[in-house]
Amino acid sequence: MSATPSTLVWAAAADPDLHAFADDPFWLILLKAVAVFAFLLLMTLFAIVFERKVVAKMQQRVGPNRHGPRGWLQSLADGAKLMLKEDLIPVLADKPIFILAPIVSAVPAFLAFAVIPFGPEVSIFGERTTLQLADLPVSVLYLLAAASLGVYGLILSGWSSGSTYPLLGSLRSAAQIISYEVAMGLAFVAVFIYAGTLSTSGIVAGQSGRWYIVLVPSFVLYCISMVGETNRTPFDLPEAEGELVGGFHTEYSSIKFAFFFLAEYINMVTVSAIATTLFLGGWQPPPIPGLSGLNSGWVPLIWFVLKLLAFLFFFIWLRGTLPRLRYDQFMSFGWKVLIPVGLVWVLAVATFRVYQKHVDDRTPWLVGFGVVVGILLIVALIDPGGARHQRELEEAEQRKLAEAPSLDRIPWPPPPQAAGRGRPAVSAGASANGSSTVIPADPGPRQER
């Protein structure tokens, strides 16, 4: 996740707005890389306990309260426990790939944070630098690529385990990432068309005084896609406990399992930071009169963390309130709703952007159109009680009954009124708990109609 000076010099040469990164000495780049790494680890430890406490509150439970003040060190205790547990490798596993898969899953989560701006220019040990590890002329594309690399770790873990359930979980994960990566990419396209730049620092600077929350459909599209991207409820199909035991990490234990756990929560922090950067102004304060002065020095870092925590609460809120979707519903929603809406919205943003550039400022029209498309998207999501799906099931059942041959069926267990017909039921003996096994009477040969 570190950036070399040559990379920064190349980026500065490609884009004059990035010249500040080329002036950073190597020790400062290394210091910022270590700070980003430590920030992600601390946010992961916090998010684990925060989630357990919030879900416990929603379920009227106490939650963790043993380790540390009010239980806030519970995640440290869990990490120590996982590191001390026995590390088991299945006999049928492909050992090199089995060991490498958790690392492949965790590393891309750190990489994406390299281009996230935490704050404006500050002074660190006398050196003026931006609170951002690095920036590129194509930072948004870098974010999209880094976010999609983690799926390789999930696929390798399922394939190398030598077990059926992990393999099914990894296949689900691949299909899920492919489906929702397209919708996420369409949300990104609308943002950088509207902003006119692919640089994350340029996008944040363009939101001074107004956030890109006006791109309502892109924001809704991204919020749904980021939940699917991180395999969180209600889109946690690759690790569905009731169907696949533990999913792709069923055969993992000890520190390898901890790596998957770490990757999941760092991905949550990363996609939350991307949403903050692209739609909520990044480190910029809210566009409220009186707060415009709180956008210099180290104060913007607080705004950034607060927005990050709001998105983490959004993840936890979804987990505590929504059930898991069925696999066919999940894939149908991605391909039939999200992607078409994203394509229409990108076309609308591009049209208005060209019209705005060559005619006059039509931002109010763009905002109004965004609100309309956002309302249509929300209406498309609403299916009270699954009524449409229930109708489809009933119609399918009626078709089956209509196509089935008309035969007399013997109900099981037999109804009480049929007890006197034919031979009486015979008891085959009592079981260990005192119950008896009943052999039904022979109804005799069936007569064809």
Curated annotation (Swiss-Prot):
Primary subcellular site in the record, as a coarse category: membrane
Cellular component GO terms held in the UniProt record: plasma membrane
Catalytic function, reaction form: a quinone + NADH + 5 H(+)(in) = a quinol + NAD(+) + 4 H(+)(out)
Localization per record: Cell membrane
Membrane topology: Multi-pass membrane protein
Entry annotated with the keyword Lipid metabolism: no
The enzyme's E.C. designation: 7.1.1.-
One Pfam family this sequence matches: NADHdh
Transmembrane regions listed in the UniProt entry: 29-49, 96-116, 136-156, 177-197, 211-231, 259-279, 298-318, 330-350, 365-385
Basic and acidic residues composition-biased segments: 393-402
Compositional bias (Low complexity): 418-436
GO molecular function: NADH dehydrogenase activity; oxidoreductase activity, acting on NAD(P)H, quinone or similar compound as acceptor; quinone binding
Uppermost EC category: translocase
Biological process terms in GO annotation: aerobic respiration
PROSITE patterns found in the cross-reference section: COMPLEX1_ND1_2
Chain residue ranges for the region called Disordered: 393-449
Record-stated family: Belongs to the complex I subunit 1 family.
Protein's job: NDH-1 shuttles electrons from NADH, via FMN and iron-sulfur (Fe-S) centers, to quinones in the respiratory chain. The immediate electron acceptor for the enzyme in this species is believed to be ubiquinone. Couples the redox reaction to proton translocation (for every two electrons transferred, four hydrogen ions are translocated across the cytoplasmic membrane), and thus conserves the redox energy in a proton gradient. This subunit may bind ubiquinone.
Binding partners and assembly: NDH-1 is composed of 14 different subunits. Subunits NuoA, H, J, K, L, M, N constitute the membrane sector of the complex.
Protein name: NADH-quinone oxidoreductase subunit H
Gene name of the record: nuoH
